[in-house]
């Protein structure tokens, strides 16, 4: 039997889409896998172990080697800048990082305060735009900041834009498109390159197949 592979997966939508991809790639995951409340799930038939984590923590687990590979959004990779290999764009969980605000202030570059849970990405973006802003880090409900006068603009993940519209906000600038990526711990890749390459290859075939539809 080959070496066991530990995979860090984020809870939520990315988990569901990634599990579906793994099944399409031929990995036999049990039915209860999707609904399990366990944080560590063993799949001995495939020699896999899954760690279920918060999206922002996946890169930490992979960087420190407690997980060999992980599935993380590009937004997290840009924000955290961890020492991991990004080996495959899975092309799932598509969304974008964008700037938004109230209609009367969103386009006002004089608004100096920007609320976000991505302070590094936001700082870099506005620096490139030649804007001096004060970044206010929040951990959730970013859309609230302009409504209560905490910040003139926000930087956040946008999928359909429905949450922005429901709160009277408008998107003014797209920073970048976001998808989920397969990431690898550098040491794990040296020790388990064959099994990691096989997983990346099998998933890559699924990605290309979906693009061809």
Curated annotation (Swiss-Prot):
Family according to the record: Belongs to the ATP phosphoribosyltransferase family. Short subfamily.
Enzyme class: transferase
NCBIfam families in UniProt: hisG
Native species: Bacillus licheniformis (strain ATCC 14580 / DSM 13 / JCM 2505 / CCUG 7422 / NBRC 12200 / NCIMB 9375 / NCTC 10341 / NRRL NRS-1264 / Gibson 46)
Compartments, record wording: Cytoplasm
Subunit and interaction comment: Heteromultimer composed of HisG and HisZ subunits.
Pathway participation: Amino-acid biosynthesis; L-histidine biosynthesis; L-histidine from 5-phospho-alpha-D-ribose 1-diphosphate: step 1/9
EC number: 2.4.2.17
Keywords annotated in UniProt: Amino-acid biosynthesis, ATP-binding, Cytoplasm, Glycosyltransferase, Histidine biosynthesis, Nucleotide-binding, Transferase
One GO BP annotation of this record: L-histidine biosynthetic process
Gene3D superfamilies: Periplasmic binding protein-like II
InterPro entries: ATP_PRibTrfase_cat (IPR013820), ATP_PRibTrfase_CS (IPR018198), ATP_PRibTrfase_HisG (IPR001348), ATP_PRibTrfase_HisG_short (IPR024893)
Descriptive protein name: ATP phosphoribosyltransferase
Catalytic activity: 1-(5-phospho-beta-D-ribosyl)-ATP + diphosphate = 5-phospho-alpha-D-ribose 1-diphosphate + ATP
Transmembrane parts of this sequence: none
Function description: Catalyzes the condensation of ATP and 5-phosphoribose 1-diphosphate to form N'-(5'-phosphoribosyl)-ATP (PR-ATP). Has a crucial role in the pathway because the rate of histidine biosynthesis seems to be controlled primarily by regulation of HisG enzymatic activity.
UniProt-recorded Gene Ontology molecular function terms: ATP binding; ATP phosphoribosyltransferase activity
CC terms in the record's Gene Ontology section: cytoplasm
Comment on protein domains: Lacks the C-terminal regulatory region which is replaced by HisZ.
């Amino acid at each position: 039997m080959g070496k066991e592979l530990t995979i860090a997966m984020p809870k939520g939508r990315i988990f569901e889409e990634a599990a579906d991809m793994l099944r399409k790639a031929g990995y036999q995951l049990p039915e209860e896998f999707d609904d399990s409340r366990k944080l560590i799930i063993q799949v001995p038939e495939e020699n896999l172990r899954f760690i279920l984590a918060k999206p922002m923590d996946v890169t930490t687990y992979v960087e420190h080697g407690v997980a060999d590979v992980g599935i993380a959004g590009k937004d997290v990779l840009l924000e955290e800048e961890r020492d991991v290999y990004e080996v495959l764009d899975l092309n799932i969980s598509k969304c974008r990082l964008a700037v938004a605000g109230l209609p009367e202030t969103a386009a006002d570059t004089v608004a100096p305060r920007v609320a976000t849970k991505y302070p590094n990405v936001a700082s870099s973006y506005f620096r490139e735009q030649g804007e001096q802003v004060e970044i206010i880090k929040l951990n959730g409900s970013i859309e609230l900041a302009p409504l209560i006068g905490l910040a003139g603009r926000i930087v956040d993940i946008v999928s359909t834009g429905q949450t922005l519209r429901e709160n009277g906000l408008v998107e003014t600038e797209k920073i970048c498109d976001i998808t989920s990526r397969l990431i690898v711990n550098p040491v794990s890749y040296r020790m388990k390159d064959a099994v990691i390459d096989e997983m990346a290859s099998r998933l890559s075939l699924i990605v290309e197949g979906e693009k061809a539809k």
